[in-house]
């Protein structure tokens, strides 16, 4: 019974979030909504096995990426870059 109530609550919350996001997208997509649309990029967002080439992004990924605003992209990268210090971890450097 508790599992059923929990499952129902999860479905209701997910439905409410979806409706809220759709309403926001009709006006001006929030940064979170823009980033959610990047799901088709997931398989190219993870480093391949050593020696394997990075797969080409699907057209859906490129389209979604083109719809992410400059402010959203830069703000997200700023947040990601600030996390190590906030977690007491060394700064990540990439080559």
Swiss-Prot record:
- Keywords associated with the record: Disulfide bond, Secreted, Signal
Q: In which tissues is it expressed?
A: Anther.
The signal peptide annotation in the UniProt record is: 1-26
The chain's coiled-coil residues are none
State where the protein is found. Answer: Secreted
GO CC terms: extracellular region
Intrachain disulfide bonds? 31-72, 41-61, 62-87, 74-94
Q: Does the keyword RNA-binding apply?
A: no
- Read off the PANTHER family from this record: PROTEIN YY1
Family note: Belongs to the A9/FIL1 family.
| Name of the protein in its database record | Protein YY1
Q: Which organism is it from?
A: Oryza sativa subsp. japonica (Rice)
Source species taxonomy: Eukaryota, Viridiplantae, Streptophyta, Embryophyta, Tracheophyta
């Amino acid at each position: 019974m508790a599992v059923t109530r929990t499952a129902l609550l999860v479905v209701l919350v997910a439905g409410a979030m979806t409706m809220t996001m759709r309403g926001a997208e009709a006006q001006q997509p929030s940064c979170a909504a823009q980033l959610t649309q990047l799901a088709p990029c997931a398989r190219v967002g993870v480093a391949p096995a050593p020696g394997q080439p990075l797969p080409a992004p699907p057209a859906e990924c490129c389209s979604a990426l083109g719809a992410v605003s400059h402010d959203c992209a830069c703000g997200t990268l700023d947040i990601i870059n600030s996390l190590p210090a906030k977690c007491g971890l060394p700064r990540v450097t990439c080559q």
